[in-house]
A protein has these predicted regions:
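Polytopic alpha-helical membrane-helix bundles and their juxtamembrane interface segments
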Residues: 1-221
Length: 221
């Protein structure tokens, strides 16, 4: 029920982004992540309080992004950065940390993409480029971490994590590149598709890795 509501509302929101209907966006976007949180709380065998808090930070960031002004976007990026840090903490607590050399190799594709996007958007970002670069460091680390773990240990959990990370990384790139195109509504709709799929797959990763029967243990060991 919660998952169905999540996807139906997400579909309506994506269409609203394409049609640039601000009223429908305001009616639907604030509901997307709450339904995903409810789905997670219902399906998880060991609820992670950190993950719920991370999704709440992502939810606040999404509300900030609706305004589409530099001031709100800046604070939205800050909240999303906190979300990213919490997600990395959770994942590193669950998965085995690879050695430095494989991690660096796995990070190269993500480093390349970030360098290219930064060069294209530097003039638009201005001083905010430093905040974008900080967020980029965490995204690059998570991307390299996910890719190496997937290559070294091929299983469903690592596949979910890798695909989710790639979707979220490309979502950030499109979010910036839309400022270079007149038809930004198309890119915004694509960015939302990637965001929704990325969040859903990350939630599935959390559910898949939580096998403990103590459903309301909020500690991450």
């Amino acid at each position: 029920m919660f998952l169905l509501a999540f996807f139906i509302i997400s579909l309506i929101e994506i269409i609203a982004e394409y049609c640039e209907d601000k009223l429908v966006i305001w009616m639907t976007k604030p509901l997307i992540l709450p339904f995903l949180i409810l789905y997670y709380l219902k399906r998880s065998k060991k609820i992670s309080g950190f993950f719920v808090v991370a999704l709440l930070f992502s939810w606040i960031a999404n509300l900030m992004f609706i305004q589409n002004t530099f001031h709100y976007i800046f604070y939205g990026v800050v909240f999303f950065l906190i979300y990213r840090i919490l997600v990395i903490y959770i994942i590193v607590s669950k998965a085995q940390m690879p050695n430095s050399f494989p991690l660096i190799l796995g990070s190269i594709p993500f480093i390349s993409l970030y360098v290219i996007v930064t060069l294209y958007t530097y003039t638009i970002l201005g001083n905010s480029v430093y905040l974008f670069m900080v967020q980029g460091i965490f995204t690059i680390f998570l991307g390299g971490f996910s890719l190496v773990n997937y290559v070294l240990t091929f299983n469903r959990q690592n596949a979910l994590l890798l695909i989710s990370t790639m979707f979220m990384a490309f979502n950030q790139f499109i979010f910036l590149l839309k400022y270079y195109y007149e038809q930004a509504n198309i890119l915004q709709a694509v960015a939302m598709i990637l965001f929704i799929l990325g969040q859903f797959l990350l939630t599935r990763y959390m559910i898949t890795t939580e096998k403990d029967k103590h459903k309301y243990d909020f500690l991450i060991k």
